[in-house]
Swiss-Prot record:
GO biological process: protein catabolic process; proteolysis; regulation of DNA-templated transcription
General function of this protein: ATP-dependent serine protease that mediates the selective degradation of mutant and abnormal proteins as well as certain short-lived regulatory proteins. Degrades polypeptides processively.
Region (Disordered): 1-63
Protein name (database record): Archaeal Lon protease
UniProt lineage: Archaea, Methanobacteriati, Methanobacteriota, Stenosarchaea group, Halobacteria
Keyword line: ATP-binding, Cell membrane, Hydrolase, Membrane, Nucleotide-binding, Protease, Serine protease, Transmembrane, Transmembrane helix
Active site: 574, 617
Record membrane topology: Multi-pass membrane protein
Annotated source species: Halobacterium salinarum (strain ATCC 700922 / JCM 11081 / NRC-1) (Halobacterium halobium)
Length: 702
């Protein structure tokens, strides 16, 4: 398929022939070769073992009898140096069973994939692993030639990998020989002209000789400049590549992703650079027959997304100048092959800002997959987490190996961060950061191995911004005595919230009942920058208030304040039982214990529903000095608080609002009367509430 039209050769006085970009992971080609499937079948089958059933323990023994109770899954090691780290990237993937199955199918069938999930769950790792297991295509080089019919539309040719360099070298050698011949003829003519001028018997013969030599030199120098354009440019060089390419176009501008044509400041006077030499390949051309990975796909501008759609649909894309002010905007090559597998990634908001047609292309020619945040806690998975620690140590290269107790503490932290019973977190990037901080501490302390104490210290030093903010907030509350100094208060309840997903904070809620301002009905006024979900939770609480109260609520206004909620406001429904308790306390004038905090969602029938982040909320209550905390019964097994807090706080699981009031309110005669009245109205006895359990429902994100 090579273009052998080399009728003219360029002169050798233009040494600045631009070199093509070849120091990237480029694999480009034009045509599918069915013969490749025979050699590639075995490699695609390797995807069956994509991070699953890997011998993470190498030659180390496993105590199967104690595997269930051991945080190492029965692994018997002296330190992480005993654990064999797989050489292949695919074998280092942990969890994400559904995503691995999708990746396997996409690699076999050449399908696009969109991965949506939280940061640090392995999206880029899976994409890179997929590229290394793609079938080996017949790699090709891409050449760009001058178009004699239209210099602004360079021709594109493909040749087998390695042939591109040979063709360019052959063109350059021919140009060099032709240049030598032109130089030889030029000097012969200059000598003849000078000799003839000197033979003429006139006073001006020296000047005539000089002018003759200069004229001949300029004639040879600036004529036949078109021969320069006959040397093609090697746009993509795959001479040394043996595997499919992986191109990361995350955050790339239009020129870097789609290809570009450089601006030529000298466009006339014989100084112009041929248009084909100014063509530069983009990520989509370099990713031909490989994987194009784009993280945060929604951050691409609409114009780039539209052109990406065209490339996906057609499998080829012309390169043109991306800046309308550049001379390259007038150049447009023939179509360059870009038959890639696109792996798009992003968080949940990616789908909102993503071009609908681009998402439709991916769905029409591929798969969508949601990345898991957690995975079931099993002995085998714990052993893989131990291998993960060994991988991080080997990858960093400057960390001391981890002792077994340090690995156990890291696995325990993975359980805590999961926020669910019998689960481990799959946000391994954050966990890897903790591994590196612990290793740095161990090295600074002069430890041969990273110990459990180093991991505990790392947890303190590697706190998130939200955790540091919460600690400062608690200290400010103490400094300015923002917390109540009494043991009980009417209409005031200590609620609990989560910031940033891994930091709990105590958020007091106050309620007050006043005569209605409107003559038609009583209203609920909630302040604290409540968001939509929190506002709906307040409305649901009002149903319970109206149901049990003897008061005519149409004649009263209910004021609810989330004290010092901050600029971020309040979202989620986990403060439902807090709001209900505060309003009931204010309405009935019954005080609430102030050494108590609570969290939980609430149904309109009074059932307490599960919420998220319960571990972080309990720890926040303990830090704030609370002695007791109320949580939903359904979250009881999700609690994974640190050892230092277990003796500081009592955890009280509940299933119904009547249980909440029985624990939170003080003043026996008034409280008992209120609770009994609530039981009779709701038809739910306190004694039978624990047997009936919860009514279900999904955990709140807050």
């Amino acid at each position: 398929m090579s273009n052998e039209s080399t009728n003219d050769a360029p002169p050798d006085d233009d040494p600045d022939d631009p070199e093509p970009s070849v120091d990237h992971d480029d694999t480009d080609g034009l045509q599918d070769d069915p013969a490749d499937s025979v050699d590639d079948a075995g490699e695609v089958d390797d995807l069956e073992n994509l991070g699953s059933d890997v011998g993470v323990e190498g030659d180390v023994s496993i105590d199967e009898d104690n595997a269930e109770d051991d945080l190492l899954g029965g692994l018997r090691i002296d330190d992480t140096s005993d654990i064999t780290v797989p050489d292949r990237l695919v074998d280092q993937v942990i969890g994400q069973e559904a995503a691995r199955e999708i990746v396997k199918r996409a690699a076999k069938q050449h399908r696009h994939v969109m991965m949506i999930g939280s940061p640090g769950t392995g999206k880029s790792l899976l994409a890179k692993a997929m590229s290394r297991l793609l079938p080996k295509e017949s790699l090709q080089d891409v050449l760009v030639y001058h178009n004699p019919d239209d210099s602004n539309e360079p021709k594109v040719r493909t040749v087998p990998a390695g042939k591109g360099e040979q063709i360019v070298d052959a063109h350059k050698e021919e140009a060099r020989k032709r240049n030598q011949m032109r130089s030889f003829l030029m000097w012969i003519m200059i000598l003849l002209a000078v000799g003839y001028a000197l033979l003429i018997a006139t006073p001006a013969r020296p000047l005539l000789a000089l002018l003759s030599a200069a004229g001949i030199y300029l004639l040879f120098r600036y004529t036949n400049r078109g021969s320069d354009a006959m040397v093609p440019k090697l746009l993509i060089n795959n001479a040394d590549r043996q595997v499919a390419p992986f191109e990361d176009a995350t955050g790339a501008h239009a020129g870097a992703m789609l290809g570009d044509v450089r601006h030529d400041p000298f466009q006339s006077g014989g100084m112009a650079t041929p248009s084909h030499e100014r063509v530069e390949a983009g990520s989509i051309q370099k990713a031909n027959k490989g994987v194009l990975f784009i993280d945060e796909i929604n951050t691409l501008d609409v114009r780039s997304q539209q052109k990406l759609m065209t490339a996906i649909q057609e499998g080829e894309f012309s390169i043109t100048g991306q800046s309308e002010r550049s001379s390259g905007a007038m150049v447009q090559t023939e179509a360059v092959p870009c038959d890639f597998i696109m792996v798009a990634a992003g968080n949940m908001d990616a789908m909102e800002n993503m071009h609908p047609a681009l998402r439709s292309r991916i769905k029409g020619y591929g798969y969508e997959v949601y990345m898991d945040d957690t995975i079931e806690d099993t002995p085998d998975m714990r052993r893989k987490y131990a291998r993960f620690v060994a991988q991080e140590v080997e990858k960093d290269g400057n960390l001391p190996h981890f002792a077994p107790d340090a690995i156990r503490e890291l696995i325990l932290e993975a359980k805590r961060r999961a926020g669910r019973k019998d689960s481990l977190t799959l946000k391994l990037r954050d966990l890897g950061g903790l591994v590196r901080v612990a290793g740095d501490i161990a090295r600074s302390e002069g430890h041969d191995l990273t110990q459990r104490s180093d991991v505990l210290e790392a947890k303190k030093r590697s706190r998130s911004i939200e955790q540091q903010f919460v600690d400062n907030y608690i200290q400010r509350r103490k400094d300015y005595e923002l917390g109540t100094t009494s043991e009980e208060a009417v209409g005031r309840v200590n609620g609990l919230a989560v910031m940033g997903g891994d930091s709990g904070i105590m958020l007091p809620v106050m309620a007050e009942i006043t005569p209605a301002q409107s003559q038609e009905e009583g209203r609920i006024y909630a302040t604290g920058q409540l968001k939509e979900m929190a506002e709906e939770a307040v409305e649901n609480v009002s149903a319970i208030i109206k149901k049990f109260s003897d008061e005519n609520m149409s004649e009263k206004d209910t004021h609810i304040q989330f004290v010092q909620a901050g600029e971020g406001g309040v979202d989620g429904d986990s403060a439902s039982i807090t709001v209900a308790t505060a309003v009931i306390s204010a309405l009935e004038d019954i005080p609430v214990a102030q050494e108590l905090a609570m969290t939980g969602s609430l149904s309109v029938r009074g059932d307490v529903l599960p919420v998220g982040g319960v571990t972080h909320k309990i720890e926040a209550a303990a830090k704030a000095g609370c002695e007791r905390v109320i949580i939903p019964k359904a979250n009881e097994d999700d609690v994974m608080i640190e050892d230092e807090y277990e003796e500081q706080i009592e955890i009280i699981p509940v299933t119904h609002i009547s249980e909440v009031l029985d624990v939170a309110l003080v003043g026996e005669p008034e409280k008992d009367s209120l609770v009994d009245r609530l039981k009779s109205i709701t038809g739910k006895a306190l004694d039978s509430a624990s047997d009936s359990g919860t009514t279900g429902g999904n955990p709140s994100p807050q």
